[in-house]
Amino acid sequence: MSTPDAQPDPEVYEQGRGMDAHNEVMREIRGRRDRTYDPREPTRVWLDEDNTPDGVYQSLTIILNTGGCRWARAGGCTMCGYVAESVEGGSVSHEDLMTQIDVCLEHEAENADEESGLIKIYTSGSFLDEREVPAETRRAIAETFADRDRMVVESLPDFVDRGKVRDFTAHGLACDVAVGLETATDRVRHDCVNKYFDFTDFEAACDEVRAVAEADDADAGVKAYLLLKPAFLSESEAVEDMVSSVRRCAAVDGCHTVSMNPTNVQRHTMVEDLFHDGGYRPPWLWSVCDVLERTADADAIVVSDPVGSGSERGAHNCGDCDEFVQTAVKDFDLRQDPSVFEEVSCECETTWAAVMEREKSYGMPLTR
């Protein structure tokens, strides 16, 4: 684990990207973590339902506990706390990673009536980064789930190439590469999220995946992950950035799904420090509805999964309507029908409208 004075590994992209100040703060914050983690236990595993180009599937979502995101070793993203839950030491063995997969399969067997058709695998960084997940492990995981229908694997665009995608499609699996783009606006991604790559890098990753689909007649595509209301944006700025970003992603060949997710306040992050100091409020659930409703005609599946919704640290409204609004969001995810939002209303929508009109980034948040 790095200390506040530790110098970042020069191979993790910090130098020359103008992000030294953010990274210095992030390294200090991450140095406060006070727990260790078992390399044989996944960070998270759960069952859900997801909309895909082939319809709605029961899904098994796995967050593998790896040695941590390469970018996070330099400082990393302002909102991401997963690296603080990573195993110390920088790597997890193939054997331990496969034990984590076994734990997830046991969870599925105990809690589901049938096997999930969709498997979603994430790490605290990039599943396709071979320093996090060795090629041997990636191929073994592909073989383990070869009898399922579809797999989603998350990666930064740097690590996306045709050979890695083919490790999955060669088994007849539909493969989606999920890219944490966060926003289509480079300045917001750099200055608010502290993420180093550009939109053109996302487009290049889409090209790699699309090339496999076209050359091999395979089912392969890209799922863009966007972030609603990163640090330093007002509510209205965040909403407008998301509407624009959803449309730009949907216009990229090969990107068939856009998952627009509101920021939640995770431990050991810059966002958490701002939150405790009164300088950050997670987005309103009304903002989630607004973005989904305004982009329902985009040429892609557009979904949202507000983690921690209804809590102080997650997207929330007044508290009275949160559960009903979250249900409408989930209904939209599965049906892609914006009329579901006409069925929910609350007096707090007036407060949200005032925040949208009056909140400025230098004086936020107007409400908690």
Feature map (PLM): residue ranges:
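Acidic (Asp/Glu)-rich catalytic clusters
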Residues: L105-D113, I141-A146, K164-A174, D207-D219, ...
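Distinct, well-ordered alpha-helical segments
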Residues: R131-R139, D161-A170, S236
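Active-site-proximal loop/turn and secondary-structure-junction residues that shape catalytic pockets
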Residues: G125-F127, P157-F159, T183-T185, L228-F232, ...
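Canonical Radical SAM [4Fe-4S] cluster-binding loop centered on the CxxxCxxC motif
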Residues: R40-T99
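Conserved C-terminal portion of the radical SAM core fold
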Residues: T200-T269, W286-P306
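Well-ordered, non-membrane alpha-helical segments in soluble/globular domains
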Residues: S91-H107, V133-I141, F197-A204, A238-V246, ...
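Auxiliary Fe-S-binding modules of radical SAM enzymes
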Residues: M1-G31, A250-V252, T257-S259, T263-R368
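Core AdoMet radical
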Residues: G81-Q100, C104-V133, T144-V160, A174-F202, ...
